[in-house]
């Protein structure tokens, strides 16, 4: 995906029972059709469990078969014709890419494995293709109210909330360390990480949000479609989706919520908008990421790393659907035949994919007003020669020839990061005589960010090579 702007292709599915009504909209045109599947049908109930099993026993053929059936059920008649026209606009570069916005008004339809969608004509696993983004939306104003403003001042704040896990299953400290590592590469003046850990209650969470005013709330813990497990008077208890929504309604700074909690992304049937993620969208949150299946701890940590690396340090900062696409692609490449890439679900409460924009001027003015003492320390000067040799070593020691087909994006990412690093070294070499220059400081921060990204891609390439 070369640019940061996607065209919307909207799919609305409504009705109380099959066949459901389908309306597709693109570029001022619309098409109507019908849709038969829902999660109550035996074959789709079984499909849900088949996808779950692939996370233990890899089965790419099963994933493609399920996604292909779902795609064929959706793309029929006039709806298919409109999709072919939209896809042609991408292939002929009239638009940069497409955002498939799924407005699924029946909980029984919403519970289908939409993230498995597979275009059999083009052999495309839709959720991970670089030209497409897959999101869930809601268009009924009675369900979802006004959107929040996207602009935030620097530093952007992330609150990581990780309640104590008495089972010991969740490695929250490792995930927090990964998040801090990514943010450290961006620099303290751009992003800050706050933590809330231990046996905290919903009241503690509300107070912490009110105090630090985060842009992103990242939750690490247990949950289900009806709520998240927090603590109350020394006991772990399920905090309802309604209680969480109430806190979010009083937290205007929060633009995005990441729920690394198994099953928090499943719709709570049969009533619409009863689940955790959906209630947070009703509270006005711009984007909510939640898990619709149980997810292994290592996969969840990798996904978070991929997502934040792209959302905050990628080519299109603040564009959540593009970051989601990149993160899913990372999981898809690292875990072949495993539906982990389809476990995270993105609900988007915006017309486009932008959940926040950074007010750089306001951030700089705020920093200046606080005085020199509050500024983060200037990073030490880089040894350009040493870094240049390190890049050469990375290129020499990384095999790329086997990265073809669906894995070609890894080769492209690796080479693009190498080019960016070499370009930054040339700029830093020219600025070396002015290490106190703010431009030099920014370039050093950029260099470190791309260096961390290159190391991450190299690790992913090594994982793919081992699994080949």
Residue ranges and their predicted role:
Residues 1-124, 129, 152:
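Non-catalytic, solvent-exposed interaction/assembly segments
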Residues 55-58, 167, 311-316:
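Short, polar/flexible loop-turn hinges at active-site or ligand-entry regions and domain interfaces
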Residues 105, 144-235, 259:
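A domain-level signal for caspase-like cysteine endopeptidase catalytic cores
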Residues 109-117, 169-171, 267-268, 356-357:
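Short helix/loop capping segments that flank catalytic or ligand/cofactor-binding pockets
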Residues 128-142, 207, 211, 237-252, ...:
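Caspase-like cysteine protease fold
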Residues 132-141, 216-306, 311:
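Catalytic cores of nucleophile-dependent amide-cleaving enzymes
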Residues 302-314, 326, 330, 420, ...:
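Solvent-exposed, amphipathic alpha-helical segments
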Residues 382-468:
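Long, low-complexity or tandemly repetitive, helically biased scaffold regions used
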């Amino acid at each position: 995906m070369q640019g940061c702007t996607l065209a919307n292709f909207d799919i609305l599915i409504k009705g109380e029972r099959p066949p459901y009504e389908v309306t597709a909209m693109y570029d001022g045109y619309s098409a109507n059709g019908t849709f038969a599947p829902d999660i109550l049908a035996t074959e789709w109930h079984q499909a849900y469990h088949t996808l779950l099993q692939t996370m233990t026993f890899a089965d790419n053929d099963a994933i493609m078969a399920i996604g292909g059936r779902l795609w064929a059920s959706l793309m029929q008649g006039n709806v298919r014709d409109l999709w072919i026209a939209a896809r042609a606009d991408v292939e002929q570069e009239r638009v940069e890419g497409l955002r498939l916005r799924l407005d699924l008004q029946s909980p029984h339809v919403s519970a289908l494995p939409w993230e498995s969608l597979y275009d059999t004509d083009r052999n495309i696993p839709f959720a991970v293709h670089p030209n497409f983004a897959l999101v869930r939306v809601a268009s009924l104003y009675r369900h979802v109210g006004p959107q929040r403003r996207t602009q935030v001042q620097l530093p952007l704040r992330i609150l990581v909330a990780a309640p104590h896990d008495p089972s010991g299953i969740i490695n929250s400290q490792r995930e927090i360390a990964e998040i801090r590592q990514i943010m450290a590469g961006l620099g303290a003046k751009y992003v800050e990480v706050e933590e809330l850990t231990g046996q905290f209650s919903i009241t503690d969470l509300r107070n912490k949000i009110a105090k630090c005013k985060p842009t992103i709330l990242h939750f690490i813990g247990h949950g289900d479609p009806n709520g998240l497990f927090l603590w109350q008077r020394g006991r772990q208890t399920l905090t309802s989706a309604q209680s969480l929504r109430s806190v979010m309604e009083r937290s205007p700074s929060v633009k995005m919520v990441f729920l690394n909690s198994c099953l928090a992304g499943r719709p709570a049937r049969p009533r619409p908008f009863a689940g955790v993620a959906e209630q947070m969208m009703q509270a006005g949150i711009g984007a909510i990421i939640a898990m619709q299946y149980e997810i292994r701890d290592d996969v969840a940590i990798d996904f978070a790393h991929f997502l934040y690396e792209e959302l905050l340090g990628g080519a299109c900062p603040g564009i959540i659907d593009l970051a989601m696409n990149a993160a899913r692609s990372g999981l898809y490449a690292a875990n072949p035949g495993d539906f982990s890439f389809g476990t995270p679900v993105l609900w988007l409460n915006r017309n486009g994919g932008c959940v926040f924009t950074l007010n750089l001027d306001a951030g700089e003015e705020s920093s200046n007003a606080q005085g020199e003492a509050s500024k983060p320390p200037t990073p030490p000067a880089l040894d350009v020669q040493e870094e240049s040799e390190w890049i050469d070593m990375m290129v020499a020691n990384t095999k790329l020839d086997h990265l073809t087909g669906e894995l070609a994006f890894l080769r492209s990412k690796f080479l693009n990061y190498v080019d960016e690093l070499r370009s930054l070294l040339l700029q830093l070499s020219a600025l070396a005589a002015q290490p106190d220059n703010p431009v030099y400081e920014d370039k050093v921060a950029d260099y470190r960010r791309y260096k961390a990204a290159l190391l991450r891609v190299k690790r992913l390439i090594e994982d793919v090579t081992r699994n080949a």
